[in-house]
Amino acid sequence: DLMLFEQRRGQANVTSLVERVSRFTVILKNPNKRTKPVMGKILKAIKDLPHIARRSITFDRGSEFVSWPQFQAKIGTQTWFCDPSSPWQKGTVENTNRRARRWLPRKRDIRQLTDHDIKEISDRLNNTPRKCLGWKTPAEVFRENMLAEMGRSPYPQK
């Protein structure tokens, strides 16, 4: 999903990617809404993840996602689209965006933020325990799921 900021602060925006099961979040800073840079950053962020972490991606109907066929062909991930004006169809990402707005309010000039600053915000989101995860953090659940998929226990053997 794309998070926009005040127009007078330029075209810079952020894309939020949220893994549905663990709520693990990646936030990416974009210079504008053009599809090539936005989709390029998403591809770079997820291409090395195990397939379980990118089985499908749900986009909204924004123009920044029009190059989805090339994206899907490059990583072999099923893509879905929400119905127009239906944010409840991607409630997890909308909730995550609301959480991220604590650090990224609409009035913030994100052009001043570095990629490191953006990563710190993702880290805060990923290291905050969530009731829906049994008070585990998204990072813990994501790690457990990835290790389980690879056939390893997330906990050291005694």
Predicted segments with their positions:
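Mobile genetic element proteins and their domesticated derivatives, centered on retroelements
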Residues: 1, 17, 23, 42, ...
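Anionic group-transfer/hydrolysis microenvironments
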Residues: 3, 21, 31, 62, ...
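Active-site beta-loop-alpha junctions of metal-dependent nucleic acid enzymes
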Residues: 6-10, 15, 27-51
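Short, surface-exposed connector motifs at secondary-structure boundaries
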Residues: 22-24, 49-54, 103-104
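Short small-residue beta-strand/loop micro-motif enriched in glycine and branched aliphatics
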Residues: 23-28, 81, 106
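Short, surface-exposed basic-aromatic patches at helix termini and helix-loop junctions that form
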Residues: 47, 70-77
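RNase H-like two-metal-ion nuclease catalytic core shared by retroviral integrases
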Residues: 59-72, 81-104, 111-123
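C-terminal domain-tail junction helix/linker
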Residues: 106-158
